[in-house]
A protein has these predicted regions:
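Polybasic, low-complexity RNA-engagement segments
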Residues: 1-173
Length: 173
């Protein structure tokens, strides 16, 4: 389908039935494996909205109930939390989702030291070397002052952690 103009999205495009349900099911299946400790995406947590391949979650709120019908016809920059993109039936998580999570919620976490060369390499968008037995999506975090903070996603395979940090957020030095 046609993609909405950059920076603005028409909510009428996201109020589809079967495609949205299929995208939501793909996300829920991915989340069951990758985010087993998170209850943020349980039924009733919000309304899924699909724009092309991009899946968003419009949060539920008792104080301000919103639905796609309430927002129909409005131009909005982001219709909630960008969960990820569904391509060919497979879910790929969005950077915004990584930023919304804590390390305990993810099934697999790769933590970098705050002053480590690996942290600098990740922030430049480079692929990292990891143990060969690591597989799948990892929430990449940085350890700082006894806590871990999310940086983004990496996908491990064959001894490498492929960097999924958005290009616009990468450091150029």
């Amino acid at each position: 389908g046609e993609r909405p103009s950059r920076g603005r999205r028409d909510l009428r495009a996201g109020h589809a039935g079967r495609e949205t349900a299929a995208a939501w099911d793909a996300f829920r299946a991915w989340a069951a494996d990758e985010l087993p400790a998170s209850d943020a995406f349980a039924p009733g947590s919000g309304t899924p909205l699909l724009f092309g391949e991009a899946l968003y979650l419009l949060p539920a709120s008792s104080s301000l109930p919103l639905s796609p019908d309430h927002l129909a016809g409005l131009k909005v920059p982001r219709a909630g939390l960008h969960l990820g993109d569904v391509r060919k039936g497979r879910f790929q998580p969005a950077h915004a989702l990584a930023m919304a999570l804590g390390a305990p919620e993810a099934a697999r976490v790769w933590t970098l030291g705050e002053d480590s060369p690996s942290a600098a390499a990740y922030l430049r968008g480079e692929t990292l070397e990891v143990p060969a037995d690591l597989r799948g999506w990892h929430l990449v975090t940085i350890a700082c002052g006894g806590a871990s903070f999310p940086l983004g996603w990496g996908k491990a395979s064959g001894g490498q952690l492929k960097n999924h940090l958005p290009k616009g957020l990468r450091q150029h030095c």
